[in-house]
Amino acid sequence: MINDASSAAFERAQALLPGGVNSPVRAFRGVGGVPRFIDHGAGAYLYDIDGNQYIDYVLSWGPLILGHAYPAVVEAICAQAQRGTSFGAPTELESELAELVIAAVPSVEMVRFVSSGTEAAMSAIRLARAYTQREKIIKFEGCYHGHADPFLVQAGSGVATLGLPDSPGVLKSATSNTLTAPFNDLEAVEALFKANAGQVAALVIEPVAGNMGFVLPREGYLAGLRQLCDQYGALLIFDEVMTGFRVAYGGAQAYFNVMPDLTCLGKVVGGGLPAAAYGGRREIMQMVAPAGTMYQAGTLSGNPLAMVAGIVTLREIAKPEVFERLTGVTSTLCQGFWKAAFKNGIPFQAHKAGSMWGFFFAGDEVYDFTSAKRADTAMFGKFFHAMLEQGVYLAPSQFEAAFVSTAHTDELVAQTINAAQAAFASIRS
């Protein structure tokens, strides 16, 4: 596969942008080689500047649940752009999208729109501290909640991809109130609550971990966290930036039937444009300015382009048949990949929930960050490039989730599984 144009573009970019990219994982450091520079996308496909076509399972890291350039979304964005792209004043579109979010996500009674998942998570933590009048938070090793300072402790996503323990420039004072526990370990969480009695404002978790690879919560784990938060007077925050409108229309909280106090949303909620949100119980959200005294603001928060994209997207995926279809696609992919790996004698695990899925080159169960890091990342890199050469675009890191869209047809899924069979055979030795 020719990638001369991408190579030249990457060389140019490295002189202008740190590492040649604007988000670290895009640089292919986790798999080696030259990142593909994209020209355009359509449906389930990406097209790079060399003219290569790829079946895309990254989907802009999750937002594009309808696929690339979905006609109704594009039409809505273009129509709104002609009316104005940003006003810095309220619009009815914000209320319209808020109504859709509140109707979909079981625990959310009020919502505030922001422009990124990082903003949503940092605002939710500030709100939890304001509401409880406590300072400490509990997060989980390998879970990623954006790049705000309090979260860059044992973080996943690009931090894990690059093998960084934490980040320089983050002061000890910024993380001194951040406590960490292993994912899927209730006893460790309870020990933290006991050791910090009356001091923990909130526990924040990705209910399905998508930033240390794809790791599911064990049965009863989320319910156990809910019980511990109630017992020790802390708020439970679900970071559903990735899982919201992905594992189910109502997110992971609907999928597992466990209700948090606050929820962070992003990716799908903006229909492919920069938008995110945090929301929860009315009594808590009423503390947010100007209704209350917990300050948070943003120039482009609730901008009309993102609002119309989100409105169209949520209306489309609210149709009952959508998630039935998406769940079938991820099931077929996981089963097909596992069978192909087993046939070639390669230790392999694949997991899915709704329209999210992921896999590890590992023989033992992957249930937390420590076990995820034992997976064979070198083997993953070989597999990634073998798939890329066959026109299948996966996340360029073992420590990221994969996604499907409504544009992924049965034919494309079969083509992907055939490519995986060839890839496993090629890396077997």
UniProtKB/Swiss-Prot annotation:
Q: Which GO terms describe its molecular function?
A: glutamate-1-semialdehyde 2,1-aminomutase activity; pyridoxal phosphate binding; transaminase activity
Q: Name one GO biological process term.
A: protoporphyrinogen IX biosynthetic process
Cofactor(s) the protein needs: pyridoxal 5'-phosphate
Q: Which UniProt keywords apply?
A: Cytoplasm, Isomerase, Porphyrin biosynthesis, Pyridoxal phosphate
Domain of life of the native organism? Bacteria
A GO CC annotation recorded here is: cytoplasm
- Pathway given in the UniProt record: Porphyrin-containing compound metabolism; protoporphyrin-IX biosynthesis; 5-aminolevulinate from L-glutamyl-tRNA(Glu): step 2/2
Q: Which InterPro entries match?
A: 4pyrrol_synth_GluAld_NH2Trfase (IPR004639), Aminotrans_3 (IPR005814), Aminotrans_3_PPA_site (IPR049704), PyrdxlP-dep_Trfase (IPR015424), PyrdxlP-dep_Trfase_major (IPR015421), PyrdxlP-dep_Trfase_small (IPR015422)
User: What Pfam families does the record point to?
Assistant: Aminotran_3
Q: What is its EC number?
A: 5.4.3.8
Q: Which reaction does it catalyse?
A: (S)-4-amino-5-oxopentanoate = 5-aminolevulinate
Report the enzyme's class at the first EC level: isomerase
Residues with N6-(pyridoxal phosphate)lysine modification: K267
Q: Where does the record say this protein resides?
A: Cytoplasm
The annotated subunit structure for this chain is: Homodimer.
Q: Which family does it belong to?
A: Belongs to the class-III pyridoxal-phosphate-dependent aminotransferase family. HemL subfamily.
Q: Please state what the protein is called.
A: Glutamate-1-semialdehyde 2,1-aminomutase
**Which species does the entry assign this protein to?**
Herpetosiphon aurantiacus (strain ATCC 23779 / DSM 785 / 114-95)
Origin organism lineage: Bacteria, Bacillati, Chloroflexota, Chloroflexia, Herpetosiphonales
